[in-house]
């Protein structure tokens, strides 16, 4: 009967933890040996600079609380260059036909924001162009916003569109005495 309860305890996780601690020591020893071999390989390859982990990598490699002393791990990570050179480019495009839509999508794929002015196109081709570019924007996890009649803003996933600007402008307008009109159709306030 006691063996049944000990099996239940082991299954639930209330069993004797000493068995698991012994296994952990074996794995640590194997891991240390693999680490030494990896460091030796890097040193012979001449990439000793890549063997020093960053602070973020050290923090993420720390052992969980209660598992004993924290161990440092050295990872062989790949550094991926970011294509953005710090300059965000916004293109204003006024296409004349649907055939220009793939070029617009290519700009989005190149991580450039596009303001699309479709007022020069007939309505059927304009609708077709918007559908095409909107579908491509969705496919690359981009964002879109209608700015005005026939004018749309399409951005890649690295650019977020915020519609909070009007409330910020209202606050700034109130801070300067409320003399600026945010809505051109709104009647002007009399200056007092």
Swiss-Prot record:
Q: Does the keyword Cell cycle apply?
A: yes
Q: Where is this region: Disordered?
A: 15-70
Keywords from the named record: Cell cycle, Cell division, Cytoplasm, Septation
Query: Which biological process annotations from GO are given for this protein?
Result: division septum assembly; FtsZ-dependent cytokinesis
According to the UniProt entry, which residue ranges have a biased composition of type Acidic residues?
18-28
Query: Where is the sequence biased in composition, kind Low complexity?
Result: 43-63
- Domain of life from the UniProt record: Bacteria
Q: Which GO terms describe its cellular component?
A: cytoplasm
Q: Where is the composition biased (Basic and acidic residues)?
A: 29-42
The record's disulfide annotation reads: none
State the Pfam families in the record.
SepF
What is the predominant subcellular site recorded for this chain? cytoplasm
Protein's cellular compartments = Cytoplasm
Functional summary from the UniProt entry:
Cell division protein that is part of the divisome complex and is recruited early to the Z-ring. Probably stimulates Z-ring formation, perhaps through the cross-linking of FtsZ protofilaments. Its function overlaps with FtsA.
Assembly notes: Homodimer. Interacts with FtsZ.
Return the HAMAP family for the record: SepF
The record's family statement is: Belongs to the SepF family.
Q: Which named protein is this?
A: Cell division protein SepF
Species of provenance: Gloeobacter violaceus (strain ATCC 29082 / PCC 7421)
